[in-house]
Amino acid sequence: MEALVYTFLLVSTLGIIFFAIFFREPPKVPTKKTK
């Protein structure tokens, strides 16, 4: 049970940090992704 809780906390924290950085600074790498 503890492993599951720690994994969830780790993933959620990384996700929040990733989205915060992504929305604060748009990626400067040119993407050829067409939407």
Swiss-Prot record:
The chain crosses the membrane at residues 3-23. The keyword Cell wall biogenesis/degradation does not apply. It is found in: Plastid, Chloroplast thylakoid membrane. The keyword Secreted does not apply. SUPFAM superfamilies: Photosystem II reaction center protein T, PsbT (SSF161029). Found at the monomer-monomer interface of the photosystem II (PS II) dimer, plays a role in assembly and dimerization of PSII. PSII is a light-driven water plastoquinone oxidoreductase, using light energy to abstract electrons from H(2)O, generating a proton gradient subsequently used for ATP formation. Belongs to the PsbT family. This is Photosystem II reaction center protein T. The gene is psbT.
